[in-house]
Amino acid sequence: MFKSLHQYAHVFSRLSLFGLAFAAAAQAQSQSLTVISFGGATKAAQEQAYFKPFERSGGGQVVAGEYNGEMAKVKAMVDVGKVSWDVVEVESPELLRGCDEGLFERLDPARFGDPAQFVPGTFSECGVATYVWSMVMAYDSTKLARAPQSWADFWNVREFPGKRGLRKGAKYTLEVALLADGVKAEDLYKVLATPEGVSRAFAKLDQLKPNIQWWEAGAQPPQWLAAGDVVMSAAYNGRIAAAQKEGVKLAIVWPGSLYDPEYWAVVKGTPNKALAEKFIAFASQPQTQKVFSEQIPYGPVHKGTLALLPKTVQEALPTAPANLEGARAVDAEFWVDHGEELEQRFNAWAAR
């Protein structure tokens, strides 16, 4: 009798443990995390590398959304205390500005791995870098008699007739205008920090203005190039690579490109901060970053990832040594300090 009761107790104990484990797993699966990124080919790669694997690992459901980087939407949520986004993908100037304005949670780098295993600049007070991208010059190789070599060629409508695509904003657009005007990449922000440099950039844009078609979403440049609406465009390298995979005959000019990390940030006041940090840690592993870079050629930030990637993939990354020749890192601090005034001036100029 005692043996029988002992057996029942043992079975009951095991069933209880199983029930607790099942309940914990069910609770994890019932948790959802809203992750907002820039959409398009990048979001598709994130789905394969991060969102779906995170769900399969039991981390919780990922509700994926997209935006065009409008910090006003984040600010509105934080200001009224109704935060519906948990994790957002942001560019470095917006990360620094948003951190200063209290829009993002402070993050502890120790939660995401050994900092020595990541490229410099991965960890910020309010963000963790997820990949490195480049703003490049792209063109349709079937529509030009010869290949353009520089932003000076981009401005040369006599030898390269046709419309040009440029991002509708001061950031990146003022930089390429100065590069087209002969400013060296290493002197770019030193010149742009002066009133004379700013006037020089806008004067250069005046020359091209009748031939410019402005884009606001990253998907537009490859679409316009493929349709023949423009013959050259500033574009995100990953968007051009996605079009190339589909058989569109687009080419990239790497010298004069502008590269920058993209970051994950956690929106201030989210009730899911712990889950958000868990997701970011998951997305910061070499294996998950490998899958991402195989889907879209953006540079990984974990140093251990490169050894896992085929050579052909490594050569297409913005961080490949050959692609960094003549390239310039975006100066995020410059845009934090001068962004508002330059965007206002740009908007007034574009409206004329």
UniProtKB/Swiss-Prot annotation:
UniProt GO MF annotations: thiamine binding; thiamine pyrophosphate binding
Function: Binds specifically gamma-aminobutyric acid (GABA) with nanomolar affinity. Does not bind structurally related compounds such as 4-aminovaleric acid, spermidine, histamine and butyric acid.
GO CC annotation terms, alphabetical: outer membrane-bounded periplasmic space
Keywords: Periplasm, Signal, Transport
One GO biological process term: thiamine transport
Residues spanning the signal sequence: 1-28
Main location: periplasm
Pfam families: SBP_bac_8
InterPro entries xrefs: SBP
Protein's name in the database: Gamma-aminobutyric acid-binding protein
Family stated for the protein in its record: Belongs to the bacterial solute-binding protein 1 family.
Location relative to the cell: Periplasm
TM ranges: none
